[in-house]
Structure formats: structure tokens, C-alpha cells
């Protein structure tokens, strides 16, 4: 069975009707704010893509995609997306988006190998976004400015939610704190990556951890990243590797850190080749997506994903993501959650 994290003195603040209304309020308001902040146009996204083109997101490189044959294509295999990280960049080229503008989608995915708990579901829904940037924007300072604008949109949505439902009290700090994964390692050398995230988030409330995917000074990664979307190997102006990271907050309902978004400046030709070599995946250079990038047919970009159910869960102060979205959960998990006051949909 999956793991259940026991909430801290949990009592739902909204009934089922209020919860459904709150979900709609948050989703409508946040996506409007996000699109305005980053100048994004909504586009329609696929649920599945053809296998073998290198378009699907490999996540950490070990997760199996849900696959099925297509009769009218001679049983060619399609994969349900894990995310749209690479598809979005292809779409930027197709739509001929100018620098400073971008796209966002309502992304729905199935991650069959997900380890289920209060935050992780088989079903993933997120706002996947991607924007065209200039060569001179491939800097840490630019990345930070985008993170701050996204965080501002999150806080505005928290304010509206608390105004609509006065029983919900705001808890997000005014500012988000930035730290590199290697600096975090040096602060807490005896802790695991997850324990380091908990410690820094409890200290600052909201944190952006920079440089996830490359090896740190101890020879280990903070967390895995595929080599062909985020740039985690370029040395930034701070002298450290990585132009990507995660937005995390301290979530008092569960007494732990909580990831809301993974994002970053995307690989250019040089960093793609470098990261494929580091990961021993040079054979991927021949795939469709990679050839498009290596032959200068794709724009430079920045992008990421923001969990829809996760954001709703946090802003509505829910103890389990299954209180926000409909998915499949082990019977034992449903029973244990009910014992703690969490009624899964």
C-alpha cells in the first residue's frame, strides 16, 4: 500500500461543496494571473504522443509510460504523457512565439510508477508552461525573476482564497528564499535531500532550490532530472552549476516541505550534448526532438509545471491530494485517511 502522512491535528475547513467551489476559484484565478505575469497564451495539449520520438518526459529516467497500440497506424505505439516539457518547446516553434511570450496548457498525465502518498497520485494535473527567451536571458538572475513572479501569483491566489473562506488563514511568507542545492548540502551535510528540504523550508517558509539534476560536491544528485529539458549543468553567474530548480513551501498541515513547481531554463545545443554525455545517453541525439534542437529549429526557452491539485490542496488546507482530485488509491490508504479525517474522492 501507499504511505499515509498523518496531518497535524487535522480538521477539514471546507465541506465537499465548498471544496469543489474552492478548486474552481483557485484554478480560474491562478491561471489568469500566471498567464498575465508571464505573458502566456493558452494552447490545447495532447494526452498522449507517439513513442520513439523523444517527446515524452523521462522524468528520472526509470518511470514506465502507459503505452497502447494504435490500430489505424499499424499498431504504432503511443505513450500517455508524463509531462509536456519537450512538447511545449516544439509548440513554441510551431506557433512562432516571439521572445518574452509563451504558452501554457492544462496538462493531464498518468504516472503508473508513482509511489502513492498524501502528495503523490497516479493522476497528475498541472499548468505546463513554456516561454521563448533570448540568449542573454539564460542567466540565474533571469530565472530568479521568473520564480518571483510565479510566487507572487501564488500569494495573490492565497489572498483571494482566504477572503472567500475566512476560516482559512494565510501562511505563505511574503518573499521566497533562494539557495543552491550544494549550499543546502553544506548547511545540512548529515541529512538526506528530503530532510534538507524540510529543514530549509521550515526555516524560510518558501524556498527555490537551484541546480537540481547535476552532481553536488559529495558526488550525489539532490534529485534526478532528465538530460534533455532543464539545463542543470551550465555554470551560472554564482559560479555554481544549474539554471533550474524547484519551488517548495513549508506546509504546516502535514508538517513537511511541499513541492509546488519544477522549472528551469531549458538546454541549448551545448548543454544538451554535455548532459547526454554525462548521463551516457548520447544515442538520444538521433531522436526527433533532439535533432530539432541540435539543428537550430527550436527557440531558447524557459518553462515548468505547477501542480493544479497540489496548489488547491495547499490553499484549501487539505491533508491529502485525494481530497482534491479523483484517482485510484489502495483500500488500506482510504481507510487510514478516513481515520484522520481525510475523505478521499
Functional labels for PLM-detected ranges:
Residues 43, 52-56, 168-181, 330:
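N-terminal pre-domains immediately preceding structured catalytic cores
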Residues 105-199:
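Extended, charged alpha-beta segments that form solvent-exposed binding/catalytic grooves
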Residues 23-26, 30, 34, 68, ...:
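Generic structural hydrophobic/aromatic packing signal, biased to beta-strands
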Residues 2-120, 128-132:
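Class II aminoacyl-tRNA synthetase-like tRNA-binding/catalytic domains
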Residues 110, 181-345:
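A translation/RNA-centric and nucleic-acid-associated enzymatic feature enriched
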Residues 21-25, 29, 138-145, 288, ...:
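Generic recognition of stable, solvent-exposed alpha-helical segments in well-folded globular domains
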Residues 61, 73, 96-99, 103, ...:
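A generic structural signal for short, non-catalytic loop/turn and secondary-structure boundary residues
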Residues 34-42, 150-161, 319:
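A generic secondary-structure signal for well-formed alpha-helical elements
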